[in-house]
Swiss-Prot record:
Part of the 50S ribosomal subunit. Forms a cluster with proteins L14 and L19. PROSITE patterns: RIBOSOMAL_L3 (PS00474). GO terms for biological process: translation. HAMAP family: Ribosomal_uL3_B. Belongs to the universal ribosomal protein uL3 family. GO terms for molecular function: rRNA binding; structural constituent of ribosome. It comes from Myxococcus xanthus (strain DK1622). The keyword Ribosomal protein applies. InterPro entries: Ribosomal_uL3, Ribosomal_uL3_bac/org-type, Ribosomal_uL3_CS, Transl_B-barrel_sf. This is Large ribosomal subunit protein uL3.
C-alpha cells in the first residue's frame, strides 16, 4: 500500500545531487496513522483507511465517534481510503504509524489538493481568454468582456457549459508525475519537485504516479 495524507507547508528550493537548484514543495506527513481496514469478506474489497491530523472528541459527531471507538483507533481530522491487495492489508494493523519513508527519493508521485479560491472572476482570468484589443466581437466599451455568447433566433439560447464569468478556484486538482526530491523520516517531510495545488497548510494526498505505472506495464508487455 502506498498513499499518504499530508499538509502543504510551502515552497522552497534545494540543490540536487547534480548541483542544480530545484524548486520543491514541502509536505508534512508526520502524523499519518491507520484507523481502519476493509476486507473482501465483509466489504467485497480490500482497503486501508489512513487518518491525519489530531482533533478533539467534542468536535466529532456521534457517527464519527462511533467509527473511531468501534475500530479502537485514535481520533483523526482527515481520513482517506487507499485500495490495496488483501496481502498488503494483512501487513497493516489499526494504530500503525505510516511514515514518510513509504516513498523513496526519485520516485514519481501524483499529488491531489484543493486549489486556492479566487472568488468571482472574469473570463480572461478564469478561462484565459485573449481579450479583444483590436476588434470588439460584441464587447462594447470594455475589451475584457467575454463578447457575444450565442447566436440569434437559431438556436435562440446559450449553450450549456459556455465559458463565462463565475466562481473560480476551490477545485480538486491532481498534479501528476512529480519527482520526490528528498524524504526526511525524522521530521516527517516529503519534498516533491514543483508546485502542487492548494494554499499553505492545505491538506494534500500523495499517491504513486498512475501514468508511470502504466508506462512500466506497457514496456514490460512489449518486452515480453
Amino acid at each position: 500500500m502506498k498513499g499518504l495524507i499530508g499538509k502543504k507547508i510551502g515552497m522552497t528550493q534545494v540543490f540536487n545531487d547534480e548541483g542544480n537548484l530545484v524548486p520543491v514543495t514541502v509536505i508534512d506527513v508526520g502524523t499519518c496513522q491507520v484507523v481502519g481496514k476493509r476486507t473482501p469478506e465483509k466489504d467485497n474489497y480490500s482497503a486501508v483507511t489512513i487518518g491525519f491530523g489530531e482533533i478533539r472528541e467534542k468536535i466529532l459527531n456521534l457517527a464519527e465517534r462511533g467509527f473511531f471507538k468501534k475500530a479502537n483507533a485514535p481520533y483523526r481530522r482527515h481520513l482517506k481510503e487507499f485500495r490495496v491487495t488483501p496481502e498488503e492489508a494483512a501487513s497493516f494493523n489499526v494504530g500503525d504509524a505510516v511514515k514518510a519513508d513509504m516513498f523513496a527519493k526519485g520516485e514519481l508521485v501524483d499529488v491531489t489538493g484543493i486549489t486556492k479560491g479566487r472568488g468571482f472572476s472574469g473570463v480572461m482570468r478564469r478561462w484565459n481568454f485573449k481579450g479583444s484589443q483590436t476588434k470588439t466581437h460584441g464587447t462594447h466599451e470594455y475589451q475584457r468582456h467575454p463578447g457575444a455568447i450565442g447566436q440569434r433566433k437559431t438556436p435562440g439560447r446559450v449553450y450549456p457549459n459556455k465559458k463565462m464569468p463565475g466562481h473560480y478556484g476551490v477545485d480538486q486538482v491532481t498534479t501528476q508525475n512529480l519527482t520526490v526530491v528528498d524524504v526526511d523520516v525524522e521530521k516527517g517531510l516529503v519534498l516533491v519537485k514543483g508546485a502542487v495545488a492548494g494554499h499553505n497548510n492545505g491538506v494534500v494526498y500523495i499517491r504513486p504516479s498512475i501514468k508511470a505505472a502504466m508506462r512500466a506495464q506497457h514496456k514490460a508487455a512489449r518486452g515480453a
